[in-house]
């Protein structure tokens, strides 16, 4: 055992494994309170930064014909160790040993349970490869305990997608091991999945029904551009418009009160269809078939493990958004590398290899520089995001060349300009943001800007759009009510007031209490004035 540990440490000391370890660590644990997005943006920024360093290092080694170290078992151990620390972190939150403030419950080092659960799901199969390489019963027992630890952490996260993904991996792995007939295996597997699906549905029924609405509206988007899709990041750019149009046509829809402000279709396959159309889905299918061919062409147990990891991602992708997280991409590319490895022999001429290495080094340095600028801009944005002074508004303008394609930055910039009374500039930035992002809050902001510009028809249009996007919200209706009062349309104002008072409440809040109380006071005052005028006349 001591000898094997020594050789493992010796392997890990090689630069490729150090960088791969760092890549996995930052993609899972990186966060920054000095960025406006505490979890996701830091993970992506620092993961890409380490990946670029990784690319430069292997390009330099290849240029000088040095041996590249890509031992699958060693890299699998790295993934398992990183996932183990993540599982322990989540369990520590569950036991309240670690203080955390997150409304979603057990999230580990992620923004919600989905990231936590998917990282453990895709790391689970690599424990099997580690067990396969170990002869010591003690270490096999330790690895089996780790597998149980991963499964337990997924369960306490209450991630339904994680439970289904984990169950898929376990069922496929146990399929050949169970000493029963194939027919019984199929029946048992189907029963387990159906039970898990129904259980997941009724565990959080409102959430599941909300996803059905999202998938319904997403299908309408696909129908409008079935072959080539709507382009990159199409869901964020257009989905809320489709949801608003659908709910305006069917205002009494049973899912209307569940509609919310969303930026993901909760299904990665739908996302591909929305962005790239059926052509993109077809390419994805051919890619999967190609990997299966490579798997059977040169079968090895490590390829089976990689395929199980990809299965976890594939199942998780049916109900959530695993590709939002950089660690999933790292493991997915690693899985693909393992499956392709040995299936084909690539012979690259020496000159071409050298040219590719030089290009990779130069491109890596350029990306590294641009990324450092982006990270610096993210820190500067966070420093000014919550204090819209004149100086900070000028700082927003200075950051536009770097962050001008980020809809969240543009929205905050438009809000800052609006707060300082720069209506025209605020409108221009908000409309620029609108090309990237269809959003409830953005519609309210546009309505406020047009209202202050005395363009009441445009203001009402945006308020109504916001109301149809999220029918359960009271703020758009109250803004329309206030607009009618402002222009002196008493009849429409009274009708809107009655609508607000009769509207059912989805989630009780101080804002809703204030709106209803204010509208009720206004109606009481109006009623008092009318009674007084009738008494004077009589």
Describe each region flagged by the PLM.
Residues 17-33, 46-61, 65, 70-102, ...:
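Alpha-helical transmembrane segments of multi-pass inner-membrane proteins
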Residues 101-103, 232-274:
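Interfacial juxtamembrane loops and adjacent helix segments
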Residues 200-213, 359-391, 408:
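Hydrophobic alpha-helical transmembrane segments in integral membrane proteins
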Residues 379, 408-412, 441-445, 474-482, ...:
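Alpha-solenoid helical repeat scaffolds
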Residues 403-405, 437-438, 471, 505:
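Short coil turns that delineate tetratricopeptide repeat
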Residues 526, 530-538:
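Single conserved hydrophobic/aromatic residue that forms the stacking wall/gate
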């Amino acid at each position: 055992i001591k000898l094997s540990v020594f050789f493992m440490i010796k392997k890990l000391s090689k630069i490729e494994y150090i960088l791969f370890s760092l890549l996995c660590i930052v993609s899972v644990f990186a966060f920054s309170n000095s960025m406006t997005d505490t979890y996701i943006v830091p993970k992506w920024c620092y993961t890409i930064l380490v990946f670029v360093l990784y690319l430069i290092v292997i390009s330099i080694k290849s240029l000088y014909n040095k041996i590249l170290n890509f031992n699958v078992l060693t890299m699998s151990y790295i993934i398992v160790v990183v996932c183990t620390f993540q599982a322990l972190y989540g369990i520590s939150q569950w036991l309240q040993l670690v203080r955390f403030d997150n409304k979603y419950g057990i999230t580990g080092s992620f923004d919600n349970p989905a990231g936590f659960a998917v990282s453990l799901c895709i790391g689970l199969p690599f424990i099997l490869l580690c067990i396969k390489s170990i002869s010591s019963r003690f270490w096999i027992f330790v690895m089996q305990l780790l597998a149980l630890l991963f499964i337990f952490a997924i369960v306490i996260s209450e991630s339904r997608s994680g439970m289904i993904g984990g169950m898929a991996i376990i069922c496929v792995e146990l399929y050949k091991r169970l000493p029963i007939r194939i027919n019984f295996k199929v029946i048992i597997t189907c029963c387990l999945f159906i039970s898990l699906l129904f259980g997941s549905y009724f565990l959080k029924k409102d959430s599941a029904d909300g996803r059905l609405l999202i998938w319904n509206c997403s299908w309408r988007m696909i129908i409008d551009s079935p072959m080539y899709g709507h382009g990159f990041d199409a869901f964020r750019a257009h989905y809320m418009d489709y949801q608003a149009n659908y709910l305006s046509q069917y205002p009494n829809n049973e899912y209307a009160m569940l509609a919310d402000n969303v930026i993901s279709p909760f299904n990665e396959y739908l996302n591909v269809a929305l962005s790239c159309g059926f052509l993109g889905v077809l390419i994805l299918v051919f890619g999967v078939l190609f990997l299966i061919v490579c798997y059977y062409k040169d079968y090895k147990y490590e390829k089976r493990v990689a395929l199980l990891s990809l299965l976890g991602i594939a199942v998780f992708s049916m109900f959530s958004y695993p590709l939002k997280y950089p660690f999933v991409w790292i493991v997915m590319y690693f899985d693909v590398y393992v499956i392709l490895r040995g299936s084909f022999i690539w012979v690259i001429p020496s000159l071409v290899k050298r040219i590719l290495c030089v290009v990779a080094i130069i491109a890596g340095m350029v990306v590294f520089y641009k990324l450092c600028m982006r990270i610096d801009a993210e820190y500067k944005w966070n420093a000014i995001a919550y204090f819209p002074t004149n100086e900070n508004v000028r700082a927003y303008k200075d950051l536009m060349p770097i962050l001008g394609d980020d809809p969240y930055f543009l929205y905050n910039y438009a809000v800052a300009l609006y707060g300082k009374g720069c209506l025209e500039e605020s409108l221009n930035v908000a409309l620029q943001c609108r090309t990237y992002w269809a959003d409830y809050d953005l519609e309210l902001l546009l309505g406020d800007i047009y209202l202050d510009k005395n363009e009441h028809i445009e203001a009402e249009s945006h308020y109504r759009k916001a109301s149809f996007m999220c029918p359960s919200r009271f703020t758009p209706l109250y803004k329309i009510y206030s607009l009618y009062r402002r222009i002196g349309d008493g009849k429409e104002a009274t009708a809107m007031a009655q609508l607000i008072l009769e509207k059912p409440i989805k989630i009780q809040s101080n804002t809703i209490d204030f709106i209803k109380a204010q509208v009720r006071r206004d109606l009481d005052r109006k009623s008092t004035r009318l009674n007084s005028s009738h008494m004077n006349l009589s």
